Amino acid sequence: MNFTGSPMNTFTSAFLGGIIGAVLMDITETAMARFGIRSGVNVSLVGRWFLGLTRVRLAHTDIQASVSMPHEAGLGWAFHFLIGGGGVALIYPAVLLAMDVTSPVHPILGGLMFGLVTSLLPWLVLLPAFGWGWFGRSGPAGANALLASPLSHIPYGIGVGAVMTLGSGFQ
């Protein structure tokens, strides 16, 4: 397996793969909720957090108790897909190129591993900023972010790896 495409194609494919991966993540989260596995996070809360960032509010005591803001759901969806989906996916090819790795061992397996690593972002950034503690320990009743995050990030990573394989020259 070798990388045969241009870096621009690689980053474009990763970004698009991140958006597709975010869709796969949402489908997985919906399915997991039927089995009682939930992180407690929803797009309105993500939008509320993002709007708080624009006002230099990095963290909440409990984001659910924070006043809801106009357009938070729409901004939450935009943040989820453009920053959380596509933007985070750009880290994957950047790391590969920085390490002078011509291709992961297997593009889909590499994507899956990347997806698992991205579970650290909600555990160590988003959930503490929501006021729910490391790994979401103090999240809403019934939430299990420790389990929900890796289970939903696996399909995200597979989406990134698959689109990079198809669109950027990983073979």
Summary of predicted features, one role per range:
Residues 1-171:
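Juxtamembrane/disordered regions of integral membrane proteins
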